[in-house]
Amino acid sequence: MGTIFASCTVNRTPMDRQPHQWLCERSSEDVECQRALLALERLPRHVAIIMDGNGRWATARNLPRIAGHREGIESVRDIVKASAELGIGYLTLYAFSTENWKRPEAEVSALMRLLEYYLRAELDELDRNNVRINAIGKLVALPKRVQRILTRAIERTAGNTGLVLTLALSYSGRWDIVRAVQMIALDVRRGKLSPEDISDELFGSYLSTAGMPEPDLLIRTSGELRVSNFLLWEIAYAELYSTATLWPDFRRQEYYHALADYARRERRFGMTSEQVSASSNSVPYRTYIKELFDTIVQRRKG
């Protein structure tokens, strides 16, 4: 098995991030799983996640909903670390939607405190591990104390070149699209643009995600089959992965399964299957490595 891994190379463009050795101990089994994933040669550049199920996780244990949100932070920590270790360039987490403001005031306040706690507690480690923090959404709606620590985190990590961790806060896809339309209309009225200038590329440059590649993989936990107003423009060609696992239970092993599932899919972008196959001769090899990865995971469970 070691010989197989040694013979594998990962093809990356200069803009792709390189795998990062997070500054902590990892098990040999985890390292082996990551090697198998890297050997697939087809990891997503940008992963977006709808983190769902915190409340149900807590209810199933007769705990207050905030307990589920606290445990969900542990999943965030683990998935961020795993993403950086695998060299994934962008991870976008749907942390708080515009619709979430409708929740009970006590829960919203607790969520804001947890967000502030996470940023304060994790900032040093994220910075040491070359993670760049970003945020999208109607950030002025957040409490001032959260805005301050968020601004500090963004500014402090602005020069980092590793994983770009984007937190979607007070965010909705429709809000972002309407905002982009308003700004384009204003620029047309000011004479900076003409209607003929408007294209997919130009429209994307007015979104809060401008400068980021579109998500390759959208993961949703808790088994729900909807996108919940998340990155509506950007996920046009994203591969979707839904799991019944609730977010507090979603850790790196299931994340690895989602990534392996993505790697074996055929992304067509409007082309036929024959056209895609003609442009890539590595599908049988990826299938073989996927089977090898599944064997490793099953051995761990045993």
Feature map (PLM): residue ranges:
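Flexible, compositionally biased loop and terminal segments
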Residues: 2-302
